[in-house]
């Protein structure tokens, strides 16, 4: 019996010993892998900060020899892009790396990015899509040459000189500055952050929404239509992003003065929903009567099905924040609207729009808010000189921007 127990204990001891060796080996392997990852991160970050950035600023893409670079359009070397995945996005990534590693190098790199953004902050407190370390005349020259030839990118065909909420530009920079401030309560970032908060509060309409650009300007009518930059804007999450930023300021800084503007913006979302049977949301609204409005030449006055899906989810988020069932009340009608716009299976096959999700449906992107008819966007030509967008009721293009 003793012999049997000794054998069993011997086997157990051997197994435990082997397990310990295995764990030790795995720990060494994991540590080696961790070290490799950390070293690679550091090398890549040093290259980006020392070789790629311009005074701590970034665009989107670069040739390997750095001879050319691009944001949403080709950029000068001295330009800094704000739209994601531009300079604020890099700043967020550096702070994330700092949290993951505890290495102060990443925080110092994030500081450099933040100071670059502060340099490019407009007097009004927001940011344009891009700024230029070579000065405003250099930026105007870019708009007059590169920007004005941006077919589809009509927002670059005119230099306003003001700030934009479009494409999360100002809000991405604002959220990064907020993170930088609360990370160590560094007072150096407080003035720029307060300037940004003041910009967001001043630019909010009394009804609760925000324009695409601010200070308000009306000097770029396009193809016979009014300048749309002053319209109340949901497109690209202008209102949701501004609201989220104020919520973050309320949570992180305890600012009581932002609570009422937050609530005003949230409850506006209920008012902006259209009545049945086309009970969705538009991308833009006129300020005086909250009616759907146009934007760029390929963005007609319409109810947008994609925006409607986004707003359904947002309304559920606002319900979770407030417990107010009014945020849920319009969701059934919005779902009925989306289901009513379902295109036949023949269109799904014809245009090769099959989804891996068996519950997904194909719908037109734009819907006439008065008639409920789909509005399909097409284009012809190849550039700003000979090209144009046009809208019709037939889905005939093999590569439309409408679904």
Report the location of each language-model feature:
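Structural helix-adjacent loops and short alpha-helical linkers that scaffold large soluble proteins
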Residues: 29-41, 98-111, 181-194, 250-263, ...
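Mature N-terminal segment immediately following signal peptide/propeptide cleavage
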Residues: 38-51
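Conserved small/polar residues in nucleotide/adenosyl-binding loops
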Residues: 395-402
């Amino acid at each position: 019996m003793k012999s049997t127990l000794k054998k069993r204990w011997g086997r157990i001891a051997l197994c435990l010993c082997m397990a310990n060796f295995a764990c030790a080996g795995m720990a060494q392997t994991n540590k080696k892998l961790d070290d490799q990852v950390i070293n690679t991160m550091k090398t890549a970050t040093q290259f980006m900060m020392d070789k790629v950035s311009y005074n701590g600023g970034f665009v989107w893409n670069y040739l390997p020899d750095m001879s050319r670079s691009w944001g949403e359009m080709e950029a000068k070397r001295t330009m800094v892009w704000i739209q994601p995945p531009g300079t604020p996005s890099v700043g967020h990534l550096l702070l994330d790396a700092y949290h993951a590693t505890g290495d102060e190098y990443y925080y110092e790199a994030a500081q450099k990015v933040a100071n670059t953004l502060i340099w490019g902050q407009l007097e009004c407190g927001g940011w344009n899509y891009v700024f230029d370390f070579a000065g405003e005349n250099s930026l105007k020259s870019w708009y007059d040459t590169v920007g004005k030839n941006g077919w589809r990118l009509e927002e670059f065909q005119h230099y306003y000189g003001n700030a934009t909420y479009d494409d999360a530009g100002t809000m991405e920079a604002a959220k990064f500055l907020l993170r930088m401030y609360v990370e160590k309560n560094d007072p150096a970032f407080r003035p720029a952050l307060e300037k940004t908060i003041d910009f967001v509060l001043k630019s909010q309409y009394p009804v609760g929404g925000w324009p695409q650009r601010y200070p308000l300007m009306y000097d770029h009518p396009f193809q016979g239509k009014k300048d749309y930059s002053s319209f109340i804007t949901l497109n690209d999450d202008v209102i949701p992003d501004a609201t989220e930023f104020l919520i973050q300021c309320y949570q992180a800084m305890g600012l009581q003065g932002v609570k009422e503007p937050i609530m005003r913006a949230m409850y506006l979302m209920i008012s902006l929903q259209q009545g049945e049977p086309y009970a969705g949301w538009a991308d833009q609204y006129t300020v005086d009567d909250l009616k759907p409005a146009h934007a760029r030449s390929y963005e007609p006055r319409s109810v947008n099905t994609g925006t409607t899906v986004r707003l359904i989810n947002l309304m559920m988020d606002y319900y979770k924040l407030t417990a107010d069932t009014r945020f849920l009340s319009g969701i059934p009608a919005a779902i009925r609207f989306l289901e009513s716009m379902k295109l036949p299976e023949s269109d799904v096959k014809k245009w090769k729009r099959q989804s891996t999700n068996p519950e997904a449906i194909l719908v037109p992107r734009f819907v006439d808010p008065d008639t409920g008819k789909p509005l399909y966007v097409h284009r012809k030509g190849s550039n700003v000189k000979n090209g144009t967008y046009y809208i019709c009721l037939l889905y005939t293009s093999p590569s439309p921007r409408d679904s």
